[in-house]
Amino acid sequence: MEQFSAFKLLLKKQYETTLGFYDKYIKNLKRFALKNNVLFVIVDNEFARETLNSNPDIVGLASKLYDDIRAVRFVNEQDFFINLAKLEEDNRETLYQSSGLSKNFTFKNFVVGDGNRRVYEAGVRISETQDADFSPLFIYGETGLGKTHLLQAIGNDKFFHFPNAKVKYVVSSDFAQEVVNAFYQKEKDQGIEKLKAAYESLDLLLIDDTQIFGKKEKTLEILFSIFNNLVSKGKQIVFVSDKTPDELANIDPRMVSRFKSGLLLKIEKHNLSSLCEILAVKLKEKDPNIQITNEAREKAAQISGNDVRSLNGIATKLLFYVKTTKQNLINNDNLKEILFEEFEKFHKKSFDPYLLIENVCRRFNVPVDSVLSENRKAELVRVRDVCNYILREKYKMQFQQIGKIFKRNHSTVVAAVKRVAKMIEKDDSLQDIITSLVI
């Protein structure tokens, strides 16, 4: 308010030769706002507005009191609020454009399962509050489990709850390039300080692929400084990595210590149910009219190698098939034709016996944990035997490997396989079920 009072005095000197102008139109001005380096002032009188807006010297007067001022606009009350709303909207769009986020990654299309529930809950907490209780949050897990999706969803949801928040999503390699670019500026020190100032002004910093930072000493030095500054100001940082902090190669122990100073959470592999749901979400996003049978969806999920990116590729292939053949239904028969390469790759190296076991348990409606336990209930023994049979006869696993999964000895597995072989001789329907379960 003191600055604005001083600004009015400068206007008084500017218009001291215009009789009564200051006393009548300027002296009692009170309502103003400074937005995006533009000073807006409410002036009720149209003559006064036109007079003031046509004076090119006024922005120079304002610049004596306000840093980086680029314009002064005298407006009526209605235009005042319209301009502010427009500037607010523009400011939010500018903030989002500079965030590095993609609107495709949200919590709405993020599938939550047992393997990622804890990191999801931590992410929601970060996005919905201005607290930094978990700073830094360090998320790690194998590639293809949805870590990038989660990281960007945190940023997008933060904007939903706090539209004026300063958020930045950056891949570690891009951050390293920013540091290199800053060093190659004419004024190297100014370039580095400008980079640090930009990052240190953030409310939420999201860094992807943290494991790539290894051997980039200068980059880590800059990151170390930014990290300390943000944490000291109570701001939130989230790191994502394929490895735990202790497994990161060639990284300064001080930085490793910082990574471990907050909340450390792991994203686990998806179960079959989650993979099926993820595939359903991706198909719906690509074309709501695509239909896929439960059996086909389960097989497509199983050959994904527990990789969300692979699932997206599978969904894209299914979309291509639907668009080119005009057939909206994906079933067991055309699935193997569409995903021929994926099935071949799966049989060579990607087979996950636990996904097969989960699929069998779903078919017989029994819990996976019970089948993997010591429980000897007849219905569980039967399902366990079927799993043993499929793993041995259809996927050629060694008896010892199968026994390790079910915590059974060699002879027990052999007996289970023989029991199912005899049951198949008497019951053709069991053979049909087993055939449908084999990928």
UniProtKB/Swiss-Prot annotation:
<comment type="function">
    <text>Plays an essential role in the initiation and regulation of chromosomal replication. ATP-DnaA binds to the origin of replication (oriC) to initiate formation of the DNA replication initiation complex once per cell cycle. Binds the DnaA box (a 9 base pair repeat at the origin) and separates the double-stranded (ds)DNA. Forms a right-handed helical filament on oriC DNA; dsDNA binds to the exterior of the filament while single-stranded (ss)DNA is stabiized in the filament's interior.</text>
</comment>
<dbReference type="InterPro" id="IPR003593">
    <property type="entry name" value="AAA+_ATPase"/>
</dbReference>
<dbReference type="InterPro" id="IPR024633">
    <property type="entry name" value="DnaA_N_dom"/>
</dbReference>
<dbReference type="GO" id="GO:0005737">
    <property type="term" value="C:cytoplasm"/>
</dbReference>
<dbReference type="GO" id="GO:0005886">
    <property type="term" value="C:plasma membrane"/>
</dbReference>
<keyword id="KW-0446">Lipid-binding</keyword>
<feature type="binding site">
    <location>
        <position position="147"/>
    </location>
    <ligand>
        <name>ATP</name>
    </ligand>
</feature>
<feature type="region of interest" description="Domain I, interacts with DnaA modulators">
    <location>
        <begin position="1"/>
        <end position="72"/>
    </location>
</feature>
<dbReference type="GO" id="GO:0005524">
    <property type="term" value="F:ATP binding"/>
</dbReference>
<comment type="similarity">
    <text>Belongs to the DnaA family.</text>
</comment>
<dbReference type="GO" id="GO:0006275">
    <property type="term" value="P:regulation of DNA replication"/>
</dbReference>
<dbReference type="GO" id="GO:0016887">
    <property type="term" value="F:ATP hydrolysis activity"/>
</dbReference>
<dbReference type="InterPro" id="IPR001957">
    <property type="entry name" value="Chromosome_initiator_DnaA"/>
</dbReference>
<feature type="region of interest" description="Domain IV, binds dsDNA">
    <location>
        <begin position="323"/>
        <end position="439"/>
    </location>
</feature>
<feature type="region of interest" description="Domain II">
    <location>
        <begin position="72"/>
        <end position="99"/>
    </location>
</feature>
<keyword id="KW-0547">Nucleotide-binding</keyword>
<dbReference type="InterPro" id="IPR013317">
    <property type="entry name" value="DnaA_dom"/>
</dbReference>
<dbReference type="InterPro" id="IPR027417">
    <property type="entry name" value="P-loop_NTPase"/>
</dbReference>
<comment type="subunit">
    <text>Oligomerizes as a right-handed, spiral filament on DNA at oriC.</text>
</comment>
<dbReference type="InterPro" id="IPR010921">
    <property type="entry name" value="Trp_repressor/repl_initiator"/>
</dbReference>
<dbReference type="InterPro" id="IPR013159">
    <property type="entry name" value="DnaA_C"/>
</dbReference>
<keyword id="KW-0235">DNA replication</keyword>
<dbReference type="InterPro" id="IPR020591">
    <property type="entry name" value="Chromosome_initiator_DnaA-like"/>
</dbReference>
<dbReference type="GO" id="GO:0008289">
    <property type="term" value="F:lipid binding"/>
</dbReference>
<dbReference type="Pfam" id="PF11638">
    <property type="entry name" value="DnaA_N"/>
</dbReference>
<feature type="region of interest" description="Domain III, AAA+ region">
    <location>
        <begin position="100"/>
        <end position="322"/>
    </location>
</feature>
<dbReference type="Pfam" id="PF00308">
    <property type="entry name" value="Bac_DnaA"/>
</dbReference>
<dbReference type="InterPro" id="IPR015946">
    <property type="entry name" value="KH_dom-like_a/b"/>
</dbReference>
<dbReference type="InterPro" id="IPR018312">
    <property type="entry name" value="Chromosome_initiator_DnaA_CS"/>
</dbReference>
<keyword id="KW-0238">DNA-binding</keyword>
<feature type="binding site">
    <location>
        <position position="148"/>
    </location>
    <ligand>
        <name>ATP</name>
    </ligand>
</feature>
<keyword id="KW-0963">Cytoplasm</keyword>
<dbReference type="GO" id="GO:0003688">
    <property type="term" value="F:DNA replication origin binding"/>
</dbReference>
<dbReference type="Pfam" id="PF08299">
    <property type="entry name" value="Bac_DnaA_C"/>
</dbReference>
<feature type="binding site">
    <location>
        <position position="146"/>
    </location>
    <ligand>
        <name>ATP</name>
    </ligand>
</feature>
<feature type="binding site">
    <location>
        <position position="144"/>
    </location>
    <ligand>
        <name>ATP</name>
    </ligand>
</feature>
<dbReference type="GO" id="GO:0006270">
    <property type="term" value="P:DNA replication initiation"/>
</dbReference>
<protein>
    <recommendedName>
        <fullName>Chromosomal replication initiator protein DnaA</fullName>
    </recommendedName>
</protein>
<keyword id="KW-0067">ATP-binding</keyword>
